[in-house]
Amino acid sequence: NAYPRTKDWGTKMEEVSLSSFRQNIDWQLNSVFHLVQLLSIHMKEINQGSVVNIASVYGIVGNDFTVYEGTDMTSPVAYSAIKGGLINMNRYLASYFGKNNLRFNCVSPGGIQHKQSSKFIKNYNAKVPMKRMGTPEDIAPTVSFLLSEKANYITGQNIAIDGGWTAI
């Protein structure tokens, strides 16, 4: 979802070098562009295909830094730039390749529980309407649906799977 990363990933914005910021953009956004460029050649030949990109709620809404209070975590500046860029590039791709019957969609998960501190989890759960972090099992069914023929008229969409985070 956000790998690889530079060593200063997760440090304060003021401490991130421009070269590091650029490297993260290259690894995590430009790589998607390059992959889609290569995939689209084959997908156009067979006149079908579906791509689901994984974005984030932080590509949709601004960061709530209060969930990081009392932890050694923060939300990296590059993360929001990458995820917001991915959502909008996805819209472009859907528009550009629609005539070729190619579909491009995104899912934007909220916080996914994975080895975060108990303080962060408590802070996060207090903010999200469903009062819990998500799991990969919460995300997978939507991705599977978007890749399936049942979604053959859905393109250019970004679906927030976030326990209500973006609803408030």
Regions flagged by a language model, labelled:
Residues 31, 35-39, 53, 89-90, ...:
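Hydrophobic positions on the long internal alpha-helix
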Residues 8-25, 71-74, 123-125:
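Short alpha-helical oligomerization interface
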Residues 14-34, 48, 52, 79, ...:
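Catalytic Tyr-X3-Lys loop
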Residues 144, 155-168:
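Short C-terminal tail/terminal secondary-structure segment
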Residues 41, 95-96, 152:
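Alpha-helical segment proximal to the catalytic Tyr-Lys
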Residues 2-6, 16-18, 52-85, 90-99:
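Catalytic loop of short-chain dehydrogenase/reductase
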Residues 128-139, 150:
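A conserved structural motif in NAD(P)-dependent oxidoreductases
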Residues 48, 98, 103, 154-156:
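Short, small/polar-rich loop/turn modules that mediate ligand/substrate recognition or access, typified
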